[in-house]
Amino acid sequence: MNYCDRNQPERPAVGTFAHLGGGTAMECLALAGFDYVIADAEHGPFSVESMQEMVRALQIHGCKAFVRVSASDRPSLMRMLDIGADALIIPNVQSVEETQKIVEYTKFFPMGRRGFAFSRCCGYGQDRDLQSLDEYFAKANSEKWIIPQCETLGALEDIEKIVALEGVDGIFLGPYDLSSALGAPARFDTDRFRKSAERVIRACKDHGKISMIFAASTAQAKAYWEQGFDMVAIGTDTDFLISRCQKVISELVKLIESSGDMSSID
């Protein structure tokens, strides 16, 4: 997996967060052209079964299925890998020691101690790579991204050590929680937040890892790309739905009030 657009390698990949759930909504996001979608098990009301449906629906259309897990314990991590997630984003990481445990739980031998089973991630035991378990383990360790979030003071303090760990594929900076931890919630223009973001970017570049962040608008996304982030997840599916509905309703009301002519509605 690379972090470029699946159709236009010259531009960075574009992704979003999914809170709606369900296969239909995920297919719509994939068909809209997103390169990856982050199914949010931390804040979304999803079961393992519903997460598997979401992952499958995204992958059918060539969209990478990222999952933000609910916690960093072994079952929470391993189940999302077993259902076939392409990458895991782990929230609220506190230290390099916690990250070492995350790598241990999510990477196969010899890098870690991830458990193996005939689950969806290996075609329920039919994957051709299983002819050599060593080769399958190596491929999974390389292709399945493990991305801790930097959104606590502890993670920020340890960021260089975290990024340096073998098995950590990148860092996702959580701007809202990190700005709160820095004492200025949602203030992304403070020197302290900017310097923290630059520290994350620099650490990732120094170790050849991916730097990611969330943006609420296209202007914010552009600024983050220009700052040096490799991947920017923009908005949420719920926001897109609400915004589009509000736009259509507003346009329709204006047309009715002005002339009653609805021929120009998209």
Predicted features by range, described:
Residues 17-18, 37-46, 65-71, 86-94, ...:
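Catalytic beta/alpha-barrel core
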Residues 75, 87-166, 256, 260-266:
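Conserved anion-binding
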Residues 87-101, 171-180, 229-248:
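Glycine-rich phosphate-binding active-site loops on the catalytic face of alpha/beta enzymes
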Residues 27, 31, 72-86, 90, ...:
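Catalytic cores of alpha/beta
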Residues 3, 48-82, 104-112, 138-141, ...:
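Alpha-helix-loop-beta-strand connector modules within alpha/beta enzyme cores
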Residues 1-17, 128-143, 198-206, 253, ...:
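N-terminal amphipathic alpha-helix/helix-capping segment at the start of soluble metabolic enzymes
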Residues 85-87, 107-120, 181-195, 235-237:
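Glycine-rich tight-turn/loop motif centered on a GG-T
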Residues 1-72, 104, 146, 164-168:
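Conserved N-terminal beta1-alpha1 strand-loop-helix module at the mouth
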